[in-house]
């Protein structure tokens, strides 16, 4: 599927149905089905956290680490989320995980540009007793 500049991505009806079903089941977000590849990283810790101002918008980026694995870099912008609490909630989770050195699970969509952070789709703090299942 190709996106023309300024136009929304035209979704295949089967992808739309599949993405809604998988999203309702809590397996994948709609971006997983129609967009770039996504990856779930479990039991990582937040090593770095940065908040950036970009014009009228905010963006936070984090670097997550797990011993024996490569670093994961992901960012989330509040662009498009000005009227809801999604960005604030995810930022709160990231700050808490960083401050408490908690393990996290994060879902990241690959960046189309090599060497740049992926898009953070979801962030969860693992239970205090240890590991994400």
Swiss-Prot record:
Keywords: Disulfide bond, Host cell membrane, Host membrane, Membrane, Secreted, Signal, Toxin, Virulence, Whooping cough
Gene (UniProt): ptxE
Disulfide partners: 61-75, 126-132
Cell compartment(s), UniProt: Secreted; Host cell membrane
Signal peptide: 1-34
Keyword Membrane in record: yes
Assigned GO CC terms: extracellular region; host cell plasma membrane; membrane
Gene Ontology molecular-function annotations: toxin activity
Name of the protein this chain belongs to: Pertussis toxin subunit 5
Subunit structure: Pertussis toxin contains five different chains, S1-S5. They are organized into 2 functional subunits: A, composed of S1 (which is toxic) and B, containing S2, S3, S5, and two copies of S4 (B binds to the membrane receptors). Dimers of S2-S4 and S3-S4 are held together by S5.
Species annotation: Bordetella pertussis (strain Tohama I / ATCC BAA-589 / NCTC 13251)
Known function: PTX oligomer B binds to receptors on the eukaryotic cell surface and facilitates the translocation of the toxic subunit across the cell membrane.
Membrane-traversing stretches: none
